[in-house]
């Protein structure tokens, strides 16, 4: 009986540590979200790269990275945003 109690205690401690470890990994992962979009079209020659926001964000978005290392949120349904994304994909 004592062996099974000790084994159960070890199992519970191991589960608690694994759960703690996986929770801390998820908390350290940054998620970039857009809460508003740029109201102006950015000149295409200013754009160096882009990425899409996470599905965990409340609004979908495309984040353009400028050549001056700034991040600009844009509405993915805008025609110019789709063109820039397409052009960046073709040049990659």
From Swiss-Prot:
Site (Involved in GAG binding) location in chain: 40, 68, 70
Pfam families: IL8 (PF00048)
GO terms assigned for molecular function: CCR chemokine receptor binding; CCR1 chemokine receptor binding; CCR5 chemokine receptor binding; chemoattractant activity; chemokine activity; identical protein binding; kinase activity; phospholipase activator activity
Sorted UniProt keywords: Chemotaxis, Cytokine, Disulfide bond, Inflammatory response, Secreted, Signal
Presence of the UniProt keyword Cell membrane in the record: no
Chief location of this protein within or outside the cell: secreted
Gene3D superfamilies in the cross-refs: 2.40.50.40
Top-level taxon in the UniProt lineage: Eukaryota
Disulfide bonds: 33-57, 34-73
Cell location: Secreted
Mutation effect (residue 49 to A): Reduces self-association; in BB-10010: Improved pharmaceutical properties
Result of changing residue 89 to A: Reduces self-association
GO biological process entries: antimicrobial humoral immune response mediated by antimicrobial peptide; astrocyte cell migration; calcium ion transport; calcium-mediated signaling; cell activation; cell chemotaxis; cell-cell signaling; cellular response to interleukin-1
Effect the entry attributes to changing residue 68 to A: Strongly reduces heparin binding
Subunit (UniProt): Self-associates. Also heterodimer of MIP-1-alpha(4-69) and MIP-1-beta(3-69). Interacts with CCR1.
Similarity comment: Belongs to the intercrine beta (chemokine CC) family.
Identification of the protein by name: C-C motif chemokine 3
Source organism per UniProt: Homo sapiens
Gene: CCL3
């Amino acid at each position: 009986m004592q062996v099974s109690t000790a084994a159960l205690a070890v199992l519970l401690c191991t589960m608690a540590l694994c759960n703690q470890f996986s929770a801390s990994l998820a908390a350290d992962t940054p998620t970039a979200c857009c809460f508003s979009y740029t109201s102006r079209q950015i000149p295409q020659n200013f754009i160096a790269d882009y990425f899409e926001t996470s599905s965990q964000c409340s609004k979908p978005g495309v984040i353009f990275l400028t050549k001056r290392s700034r991040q600009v949120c844009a509405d993915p349904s805008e025609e110019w945003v789709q063109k820039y994304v397409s052009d960046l994909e073709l040049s990659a």
